Amino acid sequence: DCLYLNIWSPRDHSSFNAEKLPVMVWIHGGGNTIGTANTYDASLLAGSEQVVVVTINYRLGFFGWMSHPALRTPDRNALDASGNYANLDMIAALQWVSDNIANFGGDQNSVTIFGESAGGRNVFSLMASPLAKGLFHRAIAQSGSVGTAPRWRAENFHDDTQPGQALSSREWLSLQLKNSGRAKDSKAARAAQMLMSDEETRDFMYSRSPQEILEGVSGGAGMYSAPQSFRDGTVLPQDTLYTVFSDPSRYNSVPLITGTNRDEAKLFLAQDPEFVELRFGFLPRVKDLQAYNELSAYLTDSWKAMAVDGIADIIAANSSEPVFAYRWDWDEGGKSWLIDYSELLGAAHGLEVAYIFGGFDGAIGAPGLYTDNNIAGRDLLGQQMRSYWSEFASTGAPGNGRSGVLPQWRPWSNAGANLMLLDTASGGGLRMVNEPMTVAMLKERIAQDPNIPELRSRCALHVQLFLLANAGDDVWDEADYDALGCAEFNPWGLEVER
């Protein structure tokens, strides 16, 4: 019972006004397994920028995505068989907005979808979905990713020749059979489910309570790595999004803003005891700052290479619709003898969201991150970002912002500065730069990095960046992997080891 949405409309704008306002539909993040629209207060964004903001909920994790042969038998319709139930929730929300938003002063012909992290991933998926055609007119992906999953990755056992994810539907079903007492161990559960008919499998799945469905599933901050965004051929194309976005006739080609944060990975590394220890049980300290920064740079740069430069290059080369790219660089978190947030987090994943919505109290953070010393810079940067975002929602280009006084944000091109850096004056301010990051550059860096002494470690990093993270298998090239000297290591075997 989660399919609700929230609407913020400027107080001084009546639904009876002849001029309707741009609409911004927010898709929350959380790995597509946690989170809620109710976390986000869009009153400042709506009121200060004169836009109507809608925040939506959708089914999460196994409830939102479940791909299994028993769920797509011939008697099932294509939507039920897709397994992409959460994507369908988002499309239903957009249809509701199209049908009803005029009653709240919004223009159904000027709808911008925007989301962060998993929400950004969902933005890219909606761009690719033929079922979302005409329901939105602009898109913003904040720290998104373009990864989609083939059926085998979502369904196979983890040790199959084509290995499924650790929580593929068959692995999850084995867990359910063990938890219910119908199998004593994984081997017995595997044998049992292979003997079950499609009807028996469905009946068993449907009999499990929400609590039972999640029993034994764990992950950081409540998140877990469930398969999602399946290439089903109905809700999402059967090709990778890199392939789809190469042809504007195959997706919802609209103006796009895409960007990442300069230190994305530090949010996750900061919670990993391999890299960060807790003094007195609560004060984090980076164990090896050089190693911490180097791994963060690899993970973060691969994110930018795939979700910003890679996507922008493909769309700019093939579509007449503009792409605008950014990198968010704010790293002025509080510093004391106890903790230095500029080192621990820097410009970490998710921190930019508070600047869009304008509230820092409930933002990702920790005591001492936001201080009186950095409040003036934070507030101004937030105003500037909201101005750019709302101008894009209004016109399809961030330009000089809604205020008309900001540095011009130019579209992506292969010549000159094409990336907007978003930072306070003490960090250099708002400015256009040319700082490319490509998959080829990263592969060469791994090959030449003197700080990776072991071949196996080099190969494992290659697998982590180009097979498992962000873009899924969009950029995987077996020949490149072999050329690195990794042919002796099964890449999926390296995944299992981690």
Predicted regions and their residues:
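N-terminal cap/lid segment of alpha/beta-hydrolase-fold proteins
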Residues: 1-17, 375
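Mobile gating loops/cap/lid regions near enzyme active sites that modulate substrate access
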Residues: 313, 317-498
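Substrate-access "cap/lid" subdomains that shape
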Residues: 92, 99, 103, 124-128, ...
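Glycine-rich nucleophile elbow surrounding the catalytic serine of serine-hydrolase chemistry
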Residues: 32-33, 115-125
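Proline/glycine-enriched tight loop/beta-turn segments at coil->beta junctions
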Residues: 11-23, 49, 108, 250-254
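Cap/lid segment of the alpha/beta-hydrolase catalytic domain
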Residues: 1, 19-21, 27-91, 99-103, ...
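Alpha/beta-hydrolase fold nucleophile elbow
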Residues: 22, 97, 104-117
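The conserved beta1-alpha1 loop
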Residues: 8, 27-29, 97, 143
